[in-house]
Amino acid sequence: MVPGSQRIPRRRWIIGVLLGVGVLVNYIDRINLSVAAPQLQKEFSLSPEELGLLFSAFFWSYSLLQVPGGLVLDRFGVKKVGRWGAFLWAVASALTAISSGFGGIFAARVLLGVAEAPAFPASQKATGYWFPTGERSRSTAIFDSAAKFSNVIGVPLVAFAIVNLGWRWGFGITAVLSLAFFIAYWLIYRDPSEDKRLTKTEYDYIRAGGATPEGIAKGGQGAMLGYLLRNRKVWGLTIGFSAYGYSFYLFLTWLPGYLVQTLHMNIMQSAGYATIPWMFASLSDLFIGGFLVDHLIAKGYDETKVRKSVLVAGMLLGLAVFGAVGTTDPVWAITWITIALTGLAAAAPVGSSIVSLIAPRGGTGTIGGIVNFTNNLMGIAAPVITGFVVGITHSFAGAFLIAGIVLLVGIFSYVVILGRIEPVPEPSGVDAALLSGAAGR
């Protein structure tokens, strides 16, 4: 019998916080461009369409490298990939700070996408290793809520630097933060089996609770990728999570611009107002998508019903963005956007945690790569489509309508396609033979 959690050491939660800090830093790396956008637009005479392309530049490489990054992650492990990825975040932000125009900024953002591609799958994989299933929503919510919280502290921090020192300093600050995290990660992170600070009691507790086994996929990662791409459960999760991603990335990239253009705020005003919905989103992510979900499952409620209920309810609340269309009152606009982001944030860690909950041995990074690849295609689509819609119509109404339609598609996928939330069976029969053949080559 596993001892009660109150008697178990808490090394795993130190790792959880470390992962959260990493996501916090790499999302500040991303949002600095949206805060600097008004100054960049003025200095380089950028059109809304060009600005949309700059917003999406990061996601071209980030998305395209999600699946390869997941394969590399499953092959070389969280520790090595996480270390060098964090170092390259700093390099990319520094290059952005010294760029002299559209081309240089675009190239630096593409490099940032390359550097950060393995980051989220690495957090998902590490969480699977370090936490039993009964703590998976809370542990996932730590790093997932950090993505939202980055807007709470990152937007004002970067805005202050940009307004007082110039836009280049906004990127310089994020370069320093990335370098500091690289050092911390190098010193602290190890997988459970090699962490000398992890006690046997806690290790046994993690393993007995259903943590994802360490190790590589049978037959190699390429064969596992083909097997998982034929699985309905993987596609149900992928489509649903990507639908959430469209709205998330719309707000992540365009919220400051919406506040400046539609509500006629300056940079500091927009930064202040933008922190409000992201603050509520951070709390919703952590306490509803994390603690509440784990609590209900621990009380004996059906795991699939609990997780799907939060997914559907959260994405339905995301439709509240329509309320912002018909108002020019800043208070009402932010209220509607806050409701939408709060709902979406509650669904986010639930969807993200499903990656490790359905993964077969050695497949967490690969499923994470698949899910994050399609999710981040939305990171390309949302800012570009929004930029073109706003450029043509001079309004965000059409952009918000498109986001709502995408959310409805995601709800359908979660309800109908995903099925029960349980591990994908390890390959058998023909699939096992294919994997064995791949291993022998």
Predicted features by range, described:
Residues L33-S34, L229-F287, A348, S352, ...:
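Extracytoplasmic gate region of multi-pass secondary transporters
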Residues S45, G77, I98-G104, A115, ...:
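Helix-breaking motifs and short loop linkers at transmembrane-helix boundaries and internal kinks
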Residues S56-L71, T275-G289:
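Central cavity-lining transmembrane alpha-helices of secondary-active solute carriers
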Residues L64-G103:
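Conserved MFS/SLC helix-loop-helix module at the cytosolic interface between two early adjacent transmembrane helices
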Residues K80-A94, K305-F322:
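Structural signature of the two symmetry-related core transmembrane helices
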Residues A108-F149:
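Cytoplasmic helix-loop-helix junction between adjacent transmembrane helices
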Residues F143-K196:
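Helix-loop-helix hairpin linking two adjacent transmembrane segments in secondary transporters
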Residues S356-T393:
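A late C-terminal transmembrane helix in Major Facilitator Superfamily
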